[in-house]
Amino acid sequence: MSQFDSAAFIAGFPLKAHNTFGFDVRAQFACRIEREEQLMAAVRDPRAAGLPRLVLGGGSNVVLTGDFGGLVLLIALRGRRVAREDNDAWYVEAAGGEPWHEFVGWTLAQGLPGLENLALIPGTVGAAPIQNIGAYGLEMVERFASLRAVELATGDVVEMDAHACRFGYRDSFFKREGRDRFVITSVTFRLPKVWQPRAGYADLARELAAKGHADTPPTAQAIFDAVVAVRRAKLPDPLELGNAGSFFKNPVVEAAQFEALKTTEPEIVSYLQPDGRVKLAAGWLIDRCGWKGRAMGAAAVHERQALVLVNRGGASGTEVLALAKAIQRDVLERFGVELEAEPVCL
């Protein structure tokens, strides 16, 4: 007998409130998952056999181009705790359905700094490793210890360390070989007891200076507050204007290509990488192509941040993808650089 209550299968479930673009689409079936055991039972349930599956947490990294003909698993796993500590770090575990920003704020309230640069990133804890989220000089992988996940094909629980997750820039095993195969149910982070502020990014440094930290080292809370202020000034609230945050990755090019670009574009915004390659600011490339503030139907490029595509009201996922492809085409033609979309497009 399945542990999965048949009432949990909801037919024709509306997904508008479950994706931050606000696309008005539906799922053939949906199920709200509040316990790991429930997830294990759900994926083994005969009624789910043969159905395509889509895992949604905050829905902040997905473009839904139409109704989903399968089972949507709505991850609502909650809980957070200090699991253990050693001489060097605290190990903090959070359930996959915990809202990311709330979790970061909670760690600071417990006196556990280390994640403050990642404040206000949309989505859930379980989505953070998939994307290897990063911002303002910090990537999640630098604070990652391990995770638990349920394999959708079997319902078995697996534990994975950083090596198994194969993290890269906005990338992981879960976006490649592991795509659509696992649901991350909890993540454990390693927060060092010896904390050092990271405040080198220009926007962040300016905000901190404006708040009185020009000559004194900022606290973790000050960095958190500054990141929130900077992000709110640049990025629209998905509750007010549908979006998925940064739509494109910052491309990384070889040094020779960068030097060639610099001869024709001396103001190009760039960041030298440890391996000698150069990361380019995708927003600058898009802006230079004249896309900031432009629209195609109800899909548009945000007027303050060219990296953000928005739903001005009634746009479909197909319209947003058409806009994204037009931007990619223009950037490639002008700079010879291919932009890669961050969200998963379905």
From Swiss-Prot:
Catalyzed chemical reaction(s):
UDP-N-acetyl-alpha-D-muramate + NADP(+) = UDP-N-acetyl-3-O-(1-carboxyvinyl)-alpha-D-glucosamine + NADPH + H(+)
> What is one term from the GO cellular component aspect held by the record?
cytosol
Q: Which Gene3D superfamilies match?
A: 3.30.465.10, UDP-N-acetylenolpyruvoylglucosamine reductase, C-terminal domain, Uridine Diphospho-n-acetylenolpyruvylglucosamine Reductase, domain 2
This entry's Gene Ontology molecular function terms read:
FAD binding; UDP-N-acetylmuramate dehydrogenase activity
Q: Which residues form the active site?
A: 170, 246, 342
Cell wall biogenesis/degradation among keywords:
yes
What Enzyme Commission number does this protein have? Answer: 1.3.1.98
Q: What superkingdom does the record give?
A: Bacteria
Ranges for the FAD-binding PCMH-type domain?
Answer: 23-194
**What pathway or pathways are given for this protein in its record?**
Cell wall biogenesis; peptidoglycan biosynthesis
Which NCBIfam families does this one have?
A: murB, PRK00046.1, PRK13903.1
Q: Which family does it belong to?
A: Belongs to the MurB family.
Name by which UniProt lists this protein? UDP-N-acetylenolpyruvoylglucosamine reductase
Provide the species name: Paraburkholderia phytofirmans (strain DSM 17436 / LMG 22146 / PsJN) (Burkholderia phytofirmans)
